[in-house]
Amino acid sequence: MGEEGPPSLEYIQAKDLFPPKELVKEEENLQVPFTVLQGEGVEFLGRATDALIAISNYRLHIKFKDSVINVPLRMIDSVESRDMFQLHIACKDSKVVRCHFSTFKQCQEWLSRLSRATARPAKPEDLFAFAYHAWCLGLTEEDQHTHLCQPGEHIRCRQEAELARMGFDLQNVWRVSHINSNYKLCPSYPQKLLVPVWITDKELENVASFRSWKRIPVVVYRHLRNGAAIARCSQPEISWWGWRNADDEYLVTSIAKACALDPGTRASGGSLSTGTNDASEACDTDFDSSLTACSGVESTAAPQKLLILDARSYTAAVANRAKGGGCECEEYYPNCEVLFMGMANIHAIRNSFQYLRAVCSQMPDPSNWLSALESTKWLQHLSVMLKAAVLVANTVDREGRPVLVHCSDGWDRTPQIVALAKILLDPYYRTLEGFQVLVESDWLDFGHKFGDRCGHQENAEDQNEQCPVFLQWLDSVHQLLKQFPCLFEFNEAFLVKLVQHTYSCLYGTFLANNPCEREKRNIYKRTCSVWALLRAGNKNFHNFLYTPGSDVVLHPVCHVRALHLWTAVYLPASSPCTLGEENMDLYLSPVAQSQEFSGRSLDRLPKTRSMDDLLSACDTSSPLTRTSSDPNLNNHSQEVRGSLEPWHSSPEGAETVIDSGVGSPQLTVGEMGLPPPLPSSQKEYLSNKPFKGHKSCSLSYKLLNTSVSWEMKSNTSDIKVLEETEALAPDPSAQEEQGRTSDGLGKPPEQFLEKEAVSSLCSVSSKCGGACDFPEPPQDPLTGTPQQPHLDSMQISPSRCTPDHSQGSLCNPPSVASQTPEPNTDLLSQDPPGSTASISHQEQPSSVPDLIYKKEDAGKRGSKNGQLLENPRFGKMPLELARKPISQSQISEFSFLGSNWDSFQGMMTSFPSGETTPRRLLAYGCCSKRPSNKHIRAAGPCLGGQWAQREGMKSPVCSSHSNGHCTGPGGKNNRMWFSSHPKQVSSTKPSLLSCPSPVPPLYLDDDGLPFPTDVIQHRLRQIEAGYRQEVEQLRRQVRELQMRLDIRHCCAPPAEPPMDYEDDFTCLKESDGSDTEDFGSDHSEDCLSEASWEPVDKKETEVTRWVPDHMASHCFNCDCEFWLAKRRHHCRNCGNVFCAGCCHLKLPIPDQQLYDPVLVCNSCYEHIQVSRARELMSQHLKKPIATASS
């Protein structure tokens, strides 16, 4: 045989079926302004008027100067051109997007592109969900488990679990029929149907021939306390001829009889039963499917009168007889009552929604808003739906009667009423897990036509089939959540995400029209599930007000005046700004930046002189912006210099503006992704108890002893820098006391300076003429920014301040600084009274010394002998400026914590003296958006000019989570405050830094969409964070006390040492020739103290014991549940069990004789790093003492 050649068959991966298309750019210097998902490819990229526009195979992305539009393509309902230069984009969730172009030709070109991208798919594979899943298959196994997890066991085995949970008697009363196996009876019904046990499959076939679309009456819910059931079906086909079906009539009445035979827990005691126990027992023991009229059935309690709830009006029901439909006649259905609810059909709901979308797209403050909203009748339709559901719930709960619900076809209004009634009755469906089961069973399994109603079914051009039925039902659930905020485990963000992905086609959950189509197309295996994103373990969707264990039946107020417009969906512009937004100039060339800066939008607020009437300007609906064209700003535009003043939140209606550097416009708070502002009264209330971090955020580094002297000369202000670091978390009261200490105003407690030699307090004075010393302001726990009442209602005009290079500043050498041009910046506007000051400036890359000083008096001034850190990747940097890798899951689980959690603390980075080219920092984003186990770098407020503002201060990780400050090794806030004169702020001349390639913004979810904000849930997360922080702090204190007790126990000398024992020591001392002091003197007693005994580390003799796998059902850190796709990982240091997102870092552990890097959890990783840093610090602190003594 010859040599083996290449294989004849090529191995084709699933992603090869979905190759990316070539990117078409209108300008070569444009860059994609967002992070693409797996399988997502940008096809068109160009520029509109004052915006960047991009179209991928998943979304439409428009990046304006002060906002970002990020809409999945399947969310777009219609696209049209208006006024020749404007694209009018209407979305299926009622949003309307308008995009202006400079020329008519460009507008028509983008109209054509967008129309082709949003057209109905020709085949199912044209939907992005298939490409997304196929490209995710090429990832590593660990990534697949995190990102491609299918629905949990509660979804896959939902029917069996539901029957057991609701207590159906499947032996004597009910049975599960398999007549619909392989969907041979009804393709829009599940394969297993629950019917009374004496109903045969032959009778079910006869009933199916009489009901529309063969949707027969089946039971879907049973009340545990009284046994009353809820059934659903479609309309009977009576037609004008008045047809009847005996099997259908018998099946309906049999449901009521079965409910009487299977009473609930409350009725089992005899409250609802009038028959004898013997007869009941005889019927239970001798019951057979052929005994349809046994004596036991007749002798038991008379069945309750069944309520047939027709969702239509009586007129509509009778009119349907012309098309072959109709309604039940009470004469033909004995012991039944028919009631009509008068709910509108899909055509009326579609028109109402279109009117609602038109009203919501009007100007922000129309004079006829309430009347226009009333004319849409959207709230009226919600009210009717809620009344129908309340009627069903009251009939089942209070009267103990079974209910049969249907409309025309049984897949639109019927699931709305049934699912809503089940939420009212059963608290299980108000949990995250139960709500998922409810959507899967009542909407997906029973054939709601998601493909037609949402408009993504292939080859279906009938627009009359579209209707936001599921969106309307989610809106009604939102109304219940508003009225009962403590009885739902999920929050509003959960519902908003569900609305988005009902139309996005990113997940395959809502594709196709019925379960038969999904199974034939193998959708469940070829697409991801939306429940992977909306999983029960995701804390972002957890309602912190939820009270578990409550079995209250909900009785909502259904009046229109009690309902609210769902602003988070229909009016997102009025909601707090979303995260993940960045300045558009980051993705443009310098030439384009200057052009965009000069051509600002004309629909902004008119410019005034220094915004003197800012309060009245904030009352208007137009956003507030500032440009250098203001006459009062041009005079000082050349003198603006940066400092490190953190952000401050402004009152409602005002926007804090922050300059982004050379040639770029100011950035609003919403653009940086800051949390929404609160009124001053709430700020004062929330600032009483600031949260402090408790974990370390540092990498491996070296301490260098460096002598640095720095001074600044100016005529206006005295700038002080306050830096705090801690190695161990101190006592909370002492921690607060130390936080209030600032350069002469107080002195930190002695124990913090003596125990670890890590915590230090220092100030760097500058000779700027005058002094204005402010203590460290209290931290606002909601926004993470300090409150500065001393700076309220004043205008700040920075001026120049040149560093003194002769004193050894950390700036670049004068020769280098003179070669770089001086950038121009814009001033910030004056803040209104009642808000904190906002300062516009550039960052100082090297002018401020980022030092950690040694222990010395707090009031001492002058040159300091500081210590820098040396990171192997970044070079020299201060201790608190080292970066820490964090995982995506940590951000998504605690995305809005305002407290100083280590998961969100980006560490600042500075560059030492002499380095002309700064090292590039790590990027926090990647080209392909990945789930929790992908590491990212949290970018903190670094000292790096323009790029520092874009990459650090504006990064979503820092601005939204770390809130503009960093955490040192001990978890204490390492902030740098500038106490400035009320009139001016001085700073040094900045050095120009090289700007690396732009990094896309970091989104908080795996779906690539921003996370909806909620101020109340934000605050509740802070409260939970503070509670966990206190618990962790108490645990550390207990461990520390235990270690001290162990050391005392091991190192304690004998109570009464024998004389010969002391003589041995004395002789030993004499033999060594030591005549300095007598061992029998008073000082000799110190030699026998515990200080003379070397402490023994218990870890050297102990082996870490691992927690067994079977004992760990949840992650020790994030508390997520383990299952097939969420594997267990043991930390080699502590032995606890974690998920992949909480245990992915590797370090050697010499104490455990593990000298190669092994897997450790995030907490142990930080603890080991801090321990090593302490050892290095203690070694370097001892070197000067040894040198002096020699």
From Swiss-Prot:
Q: How is it modified after translation?
A: Ubiquitinated. Ubiquitination by NEDD4 probably leads to proteasomal degradation. Phosphorylated by CDK1 during mitosis.
Catalyses: a 1,2-diacyl-sn-glycero-3-phospho-(1D-myo-inositol-3-phosphate) + H2O = a 1,2-diacyl-sn-glycero-3-phospho-(1D-myo-inositol) + phosphate; a 1,2-diacyl-sn-glycero-3-phospho-(1D-myo-inositol-3,5-bisphosphate) + H2O = a 1,2-diacyl-sn-glycero-3-phospho-(1D-myo-inositol-5-phosphate) + phosphate; 1,2-dioctanoyl-sn-glycero-3-phospho-(1-D-myo-inositol-3-phosphate) + H2O = 1,2-dioctanoyl-sn-glycero-3-phospho-(1D-myo-inositol) + phosphate; 1,2-dioctanoyl-sn-glycero-3-phospho-(1D-myo-inositol-3,5-bisphosphate) + H2O = 1,2-dioctanoyl-sn-glycero-3-phospho-(1D-myo-inositol-5-phosphate) + phosphate
Write down the membrane topology: Peripheral membrane protein
A cellular component term (GO) from this record? early phagosome membrane
- Name the positions where a 1,2-diacyl-sn-glycero-3-phospho-(1D-myo-inositol-3,5-bisphosphate) binds: N320, N345, I346, S408, D409, G410, W411, D412, R413, K449, R453
The record's section on Gene3D superfamilies has: Zinc/RING finger domain, C3HC4 (zinc finger)
Q: What is its EC number?
A: 3.1.3.95
Q: What is its main location?
A: membrane
Q: Which UniProt keywords apply?
A: Coiled coil, Cytoplasmic vesicle, Endosome, Hydrolase, Membrane, Metal-binding, Phosphoprotein, Ubl conjugation, Zinc, Zinc-finger
Find motif (PY-motif) and give its ranges: 999-1003
List the subcellular locations: Early endosome membrane; Recycling endosome membrane; Late endosome membrane; Cytoplasmic vesicle, Phagosome membrane
Task: From the UniProt record, list the coiled-coil ranges.
Answer: 1020-1052
**What residues make up the catalytic site?**
C407 (phosphocysteine intermediate)
One of the entry's Gene Ontology molecular-function terms is: molecular adaptor activity
The record lists its disulfide bonds as none
Compositional bias per record (Polar residues), positions renumbered to this chain: 618-637, 782-847
What does the entry's domain section say? The coiled coil domain mediates the interaction between MTMR3 and MTMR4. It is essential to bring together CEP55 and PLK1 during mitotic abscission.
Protein's name in the database: Phosphatidylinositol-3,5-bisphosphate 3-phosphatase MTMR4
Q: Which gene encodes it?
A: Mtmr4
